[in-house]
Amino acid sequence: MDAQTAAQHLSKVRDQNPLVHSITNNVVTNFTANGLLALGASPVMAYAIEEAADMAKIAGALVLNIGTLSSASVEAMIAAGKSANENGVPVIFDPVGAGATPFRTASASKIIQEVRLSAIRGNAAEIANIAGAPDWKIKGVDAGEAGGDVVQLAKTAASGLKTVIAITGKTDVISDGADTYAVHNGDKLLTKVTGAGCLLTSVIGAFCAAGQDVLQAAVSAVSVYGSAAQLAALDTSHKGPGSFQIELLNKLASISEQEAAELAAIERVIEK
């Protein structure tokens, strides 16, 4: 897995124009759809339980996001997830806020138990909660000090949940339990845009739809998305998050394979 592989995955997404079915939250639906369109994928958001399963079976990937959940939406997600499983469609899960409330935690757990997930993306606290380590804390204040802990969390969660885990933060860590990568792309302005992480989860879905290897697809998606953010920040750092949000969409559309390869900062984590 290297920079060129990430760039090639971007080309595959644009060539294949995969249909990404995102059952996401109502705060980020529009931004997510526009981000997928900019990247070169085709978004669809079918939330009704009456059609969620039917849409999932014809999609290239299914993305489940519990940001603004309800009992009905959880049931629709599970129905869609089971349909995706039956039809060989990769399922990517974003356990937004897992651990914040009993209902949110139980909903995340139910989805994990009933749907076979290809990948899960979240921040360290969310991943720790769904992995059964809710008291886990990052030791240290920067990526260098905390890196080992995040790597171990990603590996443990991936092995325990039998899926690819992507923990995003200052340094992103992606693992399937056996192989682990750190991605050093992105920009701090991403933290000022609501839905930036949710869009990334759907971008991972697009890359998984276009590639066979889920770990490589997830690493590639995180790197390309972060690289687009870096390019957007260069053009808007003097303006602020509003301009950055729009420019991020522009850069997702315009980033070239060469730029993606040149900017990719992917490191394979080797155990010492």
Swiss-Prot record:
It is an enzyme of class 2 (transferase). It catalyses: 5-(2-hydroxyethyl)-4-methylthiazole + ATP = 4-methyl-5-(2-phosphooxyethyl)-thiazole + ADP + H(+). Its cofactor is Mg(2+). Pfam families: HK. Pathway: Cofactor biosynthesis; thiamine diphosphate biosynthesis; 4-methyl-5-(2-phosphoethyl)-thiazole from 5-(2-hydroxyethyl)-4-methylthiazole: step 1/1. Keywords: ATP-binding, Kinase, Magnesium, Metal-binding, Nucleotide-binding, Thiamine biosynthesis, Transferase. This is Hydroxyethylthiazole kinase. It comes from Bacillus velezensis (strain DSM 23117 / BGSC 10A6 / LMG 26770 / FZB42) (Bacillus amyloliquefaciens subsp. plantarum).
